[in-house]
C-alpha cells in the first residue's frame, strides 16, 4: 500500500524547478484565472521559509508592496506555478526567516552569495 502511494505522489512531482533556499530572492510566475481569461502574475520577494516534503512541500515568499509587507505561500509542485526564477542567492544562517517581519528598510537586507 505504501509503495502505491509513493508511486502516485512521485508522478505528481515537478522536475523543472530550480533549487533555492531561504534567503534567496525569487520571481514566481503564477497562473491567475480572471473570468474566462488566464494570465501570468509575477510575485517577486525573499523566501522566508520552506517546509514539507514531496507533493505537500510549500514555500513562503515575502515582499514589501507600497510600504506594506506581503507574504504568499505557494505549494511547490502546484500546476498553478508556471515557473520559478532565482534572482539572487542570499546568505543566511537560519532556516526560517521570521525575524524579517520586524525589520524595516536597509535592516531587512540579506547578504548576497558571490
Swiss-Prot record:
- What SUPFAM superfamilies would the database entry show? Translation proteins SH3-like domain (SSF50104)
Keyword flag Oxidoreductase: no
One Gene Ontology BP term is:
translation
Single GO term (MF): structural constituent of ribosome
The answer to keyword Endoplasmic reticulum applying to this record is no
**Could you tell me which PANTHER family the record lists for this protein?**
LARGE RIBOSOMAL SUBUNIT PROTEIN BL19M, RIBOSOMAL PROTEIN L19
Matching entries from InterPro entries are given as: Ribosomal_bL19 (IPR001857), Ribosomal_bL19_CS (IPR018257), Ribosomal_bL19_sf (IPR038657), Translation_prot_SH3-like_sf (IPR008991)
Function as written in the Swiss-Prot or TrEMBL entry: This protein is located at the 30S-50S ribosomal subunit interface and may play a role in the structure and function of the aminoacyl-tRNA binding site.
- List the protein's name: Large ribosomal subunit protein bL19
Amino acid at each position: 500500500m505504501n509503495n502505491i502511494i509513493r508511486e502516485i505522489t512521485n508522478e505528481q512531482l515537478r522536475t523543472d524547478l530550480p533549487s533555492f533556499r531561504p534567503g534567496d530572492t525569487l520571481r514566481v510566475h503564477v497562473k491567475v484565472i480572471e473570468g474566462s481569461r488566464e494570465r501570468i502574475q509575477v510575485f517577486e520577494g525573499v523566501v522566508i521559509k520552506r517546509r514539507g516534503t514531496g507533493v505537500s512541500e510549500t514555500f513562503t515568499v515575502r515582499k514589501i508592496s507600497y510600504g506594506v509587507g506581503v507574504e504568499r505561500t505557494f505549494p511547490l509542485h502546484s500546476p498553478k506555478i508556471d515557473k520559478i526564477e532565482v534572482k539572487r542567492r542570499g546568505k543566511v544562517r537560519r532556516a526560517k526567516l521570521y525575524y524579517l517581519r520586524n525589520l524595516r528598510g536597509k535592516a531587512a537586507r540579506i547578504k548576497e552569495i558571490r
